[in-house]
């Protein structure tokens, strides 16, 4: 019990919102500023020693960085995500991913631009359907068949892709040497459809304990799950899915917008005459723009602290197995009556594509060699004719199948995700296609956000260098360029995933963004140097 409490405490600590911690930090750091009559910018006026003056300048620099930059990084939406990263939203260890997002956004604010716009577009796409929004944002789990799935010991209707020439095979009499067969999941028909997981890996609303042969999974390619929701589940538009209101994100975004706008306004008289278009106050512009986007996200996009388990035909099938440890509680959605397992039909019928409904069951029999060992027999019935096979598992580590001198086991393919076979690929592509509303939302806001920083710089400075050095101008412009390039990279990766479902390795992506962050780090160093020069910092040794 103590170890369980310790684990629970760690889990609680890991889930503490970074926004809450930052809000408390701001109270602690900024509140004492009332006791120091020193403006955020301009010349520091103190009547004490130079050491105290320098300390106040450093304090003001820290406050300037927190108010204009750090708040934005803390306010990015982390209760929802896009593409294949949606599976990280409700994981117990998602704080690592969130910390990585916060770190990139600190140095490259526009890194989160495409991500935020896509989240807004997905919310528009869901059209008020809470279940669909939870799916698109990464807060939905489903039950799927596992690789070791087998039919029940009693006859049940199973939709399968039959082996080649199945209809031409003769019935196999009991006692004869049985051919071998395996049951495999249709990996080709459900490519990138889901990622297996466990209840221990996620913060889950309710209880999910599937029986052997089944596992929890996070939908990866959302088209498969969206098809299932629209075809097999009763109307979900009236179903309310709990989500976390974005109060803290909204408040922090508003705070950063106010502080950043004031800093930008003050820079016209205190910085631009000296530094020209390299003025460090201008670097706040992308952060203010992103705070506006974060504000929209906080107001309109659902944010989730735990996963929801969707009730599907496969989940209903797992319940019918009657395993003692099977338990589900807190599920959402109801399966349409005609898609419940007990209503899959008394007579086999054709399903989608090349899948056929047959009757299947397994039996344990003693081996015919006289030993006491038993073997699993698969009985497949189609059109009133039954065929028997010795069931062997597929993959490495299984009992030898198709050994020398024996025929290769025949394969019965089943869908892991959908009980009656994978949906047509054209249908999945249509559901995953970028809709006109998504395209309009993303393109219009993306172009506006990308152009606006240059408009602001030109309007305030005319791109005049004034007294700034070449190095200062180079670092500040490289920072802006790397920032905007990170936005294009994020958008490009998402489009590549939507179109081709190619996965760029995490290591490559992290290295790429780490390289871009070098420009951001150089920009912060240049910013700090210019700020200290403006404040008359004397570099005193106290």
Kindly give the residue locations of the regions a language model identified.
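Alpha-helical transmembrane segments of secretory-pathway, organelle, and plasma-membrane proteins
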Residues: 2-542
